[in-house]
Amino acid sequence: MSESLHLTRNGPILEITLDRPKANAIDAKTSFAMGEAFLNFRDDPELRVAIITGGGEKFFSAGWDLKAAAEGEAPDADFGPGGFAGLTEIFDLDKPVIAAVNGYAFGGGFELALAADFIVCAENASFALPEAKLGIVPDSGGVLRLPKLLPPAIVNEMVMTGRRMSAEEALRWGIVNRVVSQSELMDSARELAQQLVNSAPLAIAALKEIYRATSEMPVEEGYRYIRSGVLKHYPSVLHSEDALEGPQAFAEKRDPVWKGR
């Protein structure tokens, strides 16, 4: 594993810290290491939730390493499994990822956060997609994911002028889940992770699968699709041991013991 990436396992929760002073910028080598970490997380049955954060208090990630670019790394270089930053092109991840944004999330750093399922950010965090000012475009998900979250006028301003969005504005638009003090950031992310661990893993996998499959469908069509039998996790969860355990635990006034089957 890259020395720029620190992995910590806390039971079923994996913490990934990007630590590349001064700005946690990501070159191809680092992106490959991040992809390996996220794919291992995906495939490890003991892990339930991942938290991705940046080292230090100023930068979550400044995105693509422009020093590497100046030395010849192309914008369309091979950034490894999972695409840029290891997560932006993993489309079959059935476990939740939390981005704990500790500072500036610019360019590919913002795109990395957008690829997560939840964003918890510090009060000093801000978000921007400045690629157009560098002669490129935010094609690691920014130009695709942001329009699903914001009105066109706001998206256009952000992607065409590179203007920054504060943590509080991001909260108002619903891009982030929580804004907390810098000192509370990781505790808040871990609290959310534990809440996710308390939910049944098969149910979460089914939810993510349904979101992916039906997000562009009308509601009626979505109903038909999820009941068509083509999905993997949704039919499984309906007939799982966990589907019996949940109501049983509720009736017995105890915490459920999920088996993931």
UniProtKB/Swiss-Prot annotation:
Per the record, the gene is caiD
Q: What does this protein do?
A: Catalyzes the reversible dehydration of L-carnitinyl-CoA to crotonobetainyl-CoA.
Q: Which UniProt keywords apply?
A: Lyase
InterPro entries membership: Carnitinyl_CoA_dehydratase, ClpP/crotonase-like_dom_sf, Enoyl-CoA_hyd/isom_CS, Enoyl-CoA_hydra/iso, Enoyl-CoA_hydra_C
Q: Supply one GO BP term.
A: carnitine metabolic process
- Catalytic activity annotated for this protein? (R)-carnitinyl-CoA = crotonobetainyl-CoA + H2O
| Family stated for the protein in its record | Belongs to the enoyl-CoA hydratase/isomerase family.
Q: What class of enzyme is it?
A: lyase
Which Enzyme Commission number(s) are on file for it? 4.2.1.149
Keyword Transmembrane helix recorded: no
Instruction: Give the originating organism.
Output: Salmonella paratyphi A (strain AKU_12601)
Which GO molecular function annotations are given, in alphabetical order?
A: hydro-lyase activity; L-carnitine CoA-transferase activity
Its UniProt pathway annotation is: Amine and polyamine metabolism; carnitine metabolism
Query: Where, by residue number, is the active site?
Result: 111, 131
Q: Pfam families attached here?
A: ECH_1
- Name of protein: Carnitinyl-CoA dehydratase
